[in-house]
């Protein structure tokens, strides 16, 4: 059968030499011939060359015949009947709520398997994706601001807000707990609030920072030492120094080494609760500087009095001081200038406080610089 006798004389010529009209369906006689040759077992490529019809047209006609049993073409022009009915949209919403990670092609298979749609009115994968993106896009992005506000409201004055509480719509997202810096997975972290934490940590005193950390001690890891009454008492002292108590009447007494180590360990545990917190690092160095200045003042006052035998900063025992019982542990002349950073670091190492090398160097520099 010659396709030219079935088609009008106007049109275009395809690569096989057949005439076709762009945008118009193939004649019904040609479509029937394609189906008859396919029933005889002829391959689609041979049908295409024999009838001089493009291979895509032959494959499309045969696929529609195998699916629907019809050789008639679809509607010319116009729009397809609406497949995204409210029933289909609601069912897609239910599937998405039950399984948020479901794919569009899985939703299409569920629509067919459960009888919601048939092959004629089932929405395509692109249509289902458009429904998920436009109509149901708000399902995966709903978040409650109460979770962030709950962590911020529990801190009694320890939270920082970038807008000062004027805008209620963004105050929940701007409130961030300072203690959450010590726990990387404890709460949401906003990088654009980093300058607020630095200014707040520099302006806050060591007492407020550690009182706030004591209220949220459960947020820190279990490897750090818990807070004790001795650490809380040492934080309330004016200089925050773990210096041993002086004897009555200005008479100096040599404390027990275990007492020095326990008090220093308690104070260091209170000043260094976390290795990840910016505010704790700043407060620690501020407390070390204050402690060193106060201890230097105590050492100078002891020289003017009855002669205290307690050094401002604990040093390693000297062999000369070990032989003479009444001799002071450290020479009072230029006591602050002759303090060795190495001995100060070794004291903390012997006391059981495992600091890194650069921490000990910074603490010794802050102590000897004053």
Swiss-Prot record:
Q: Which parts of the chain are coiled coil?
A: none
- Listed GO MF terms: DNA-binding transcription factor activity, RNA polymerase II-specific; RNA polymerase II cis-regulatory region sequence-specific DNA binding
Indicate whether Cell division appears among the record's keywords: no
**Annotated region described as RED subdomain, given as residue ranges:** 87-135
**Amino acid composition bias (Low complexity), ranges on this chain:** 160-182
Sorted alphabetically, the Gene Ontology cellular component annotations on this record are: nucleus
The places in or outside the cell where this protein is found are: Nucleus
Asked if the record carries the keyword Transcription regulation, the reply is: yes
| DNA-binding region boundaries | 9-135
* CDD domains in the cross-refs: PAX
Q: Which Pfam families match?
A: PAX
Q: Which UniProt keywords apply?
A: Developmental protein, DNA-binding, Nucleus, Paired box, Transcription, Transcription regulation
Chain segments carrying region Disordered: 139-212, 236-257
GO biological process terms held by the UniProt record: dendrite morphogenesis; larval somatic muscle development; regulation of transcription by RNA polymerase II
Q: In which tissues is it expressed?
A: Expressed in somatic mesoderm.
Biased composition range(s): Basic residues: 189-198
| Protein name according to UniProt | Paired box pox-meso protein
The gene that this protein is the product of is: Poxm
């Amino acid at each position: 059968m010659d396709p030219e006798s079935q088609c009008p004389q106007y049109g275009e010529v395809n690569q096989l030499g057949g005439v076709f009209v762009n945008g118009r369906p193939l004649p019904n006689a040609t479509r029937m011939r394609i189906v008859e040759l396919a029933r005889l077992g002829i391959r689609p490529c041979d049908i295409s060359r024999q009838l001089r019809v493009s291979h895509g047209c032959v494959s499309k006609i045969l696929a529609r015949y195998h699916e629907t049993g019809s050789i008639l073409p679809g509607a010319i022009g116009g729009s397809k009947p609406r497949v995204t009915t409210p029933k289909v949209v609601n069912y897609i919403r239910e599937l998405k709520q039950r399984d948020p990670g479901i794919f569009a092609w899985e939703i299409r298979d569920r629509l067919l398997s459960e009888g919601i749609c048939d092959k004629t009115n089932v929405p395509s994968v692109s249509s289902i994706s458009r429904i998920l993106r436009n109509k149901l896009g708000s399902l995966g992005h709903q978040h409650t601001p109460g979770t962030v506000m709950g962590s911020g409201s529990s801190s009694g004055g320890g939270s920082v807000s970038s807008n000062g509480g004027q805008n209620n719509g963004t105050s929940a997202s701007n409130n961030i707990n300072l203690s959450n810096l010590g726990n990387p997975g404890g709460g949401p972290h906003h990088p654009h609030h980093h300058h607020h934490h630095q200014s707040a940590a520099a302006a806050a005193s060591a007492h407020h920072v550690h009182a706030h950390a004591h209220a949220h001690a459960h947020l820190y890891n279990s490897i750090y030492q818990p807070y004790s009454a001795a650490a809380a008492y040492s934080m309330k002292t004016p200089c925050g120094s773990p210096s041993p108590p002086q004897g009555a009447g200005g008479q100096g007494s040599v404390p027990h080494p275990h007492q020095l180590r326990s008090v220093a360990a308690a104070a260091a545990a209170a000043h260094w609760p976390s290795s990840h917190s910016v505010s704790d690092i700043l407060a620690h160095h501020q407390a070390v500087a204050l402690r060193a200045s106060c201890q230097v003042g105590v050492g100078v006052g002891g020289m003017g009095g009855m002669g205290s035998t307690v050094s401002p900063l604990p040093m390693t025992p000297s062999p000369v001081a070990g032989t003479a019982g009444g001799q002071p542990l450290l020479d009072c002349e230029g006591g602050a200038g002759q303090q060795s950073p190495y001995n100060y670091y070794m004291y903390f190492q012997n006391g059981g406080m495992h600091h890194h090398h650069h921490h000990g160097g910074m603490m010794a520099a802050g102590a000897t610089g004053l």
